[in-house]
Amino acid sequence: MRIVLLGPPGAGKGTQAAKLADKLGVPHISTGDLFRDNITNETELGVEAKRYLDAGDLVPSSLTNALVEDRIDQDDAKNGFILDGYPRSVEQAEALGDMLAARNLSLDAVIEFRVSEDELLSRLKGRGRADDTEEVILNRMKVYRDETAPLLDHYRAELKTVDAVGSLDEVFARALQALGR
């Protein structure tokens, strides 16, 4: 299965992606991990990404798209993948659609993990990260809302919404149900 996971910071995407990847036998592809791996291994794309990150700039979509395209072409992703943290914009969603279409593939599902802002604030403040001040958290949630609302509309046909409040196992069961598993 080829799945995209959407949801605000603190919704549990990474945790659920790992569980789904294990259950479905496909790789969990996180753009954060892709950047780290390519930078650590000093690949051509990693060296280029590092220049932007070191300057405190956003990595351009074209570079992120290239990293994702390279990753989905690897053998372990031939039967599917779970994307976490990508796409983040309609532009990236269209690029992903083009990548898949060029391989005669398409997405099987897009899952949105939905959590109230109060619950997210509570979760993120409870993580104890230095950069998780209420102001920073609220800004990250606003950025997510502003960027993601158009994505939810873009993926309307494939979109499955999952209530992400509850135990890890409860949310996992809902995600599997959304996938018809």
From Swiss-Prot:
It comes from Mycobacterium sp. (strain KMS). One of its GO terms (biological process) is AMP salvage. Its EC number is 2.7.4.3. It catalyses: AMP + ATP = 2 ADP. Monomer. PROSITE patterns: ADENYLATE_KINASE. GO terms for molecular function: adenylate kinase activity; ATP binding. ATP binds at G10, A11, G12, K13, G14, T15, R127, G166. Consists of three domains, a large central CORE domain and two small peripheral domains, NMPbind and LID, which undergo movements during catalysis. The LID domain closes over the site of phosphoryl transfer upon ATP binding. Assembling and dissambling the active center during each catalytic cycle provides an effective means to prevent ATP hydrolysis. This is Adenylate kinase.
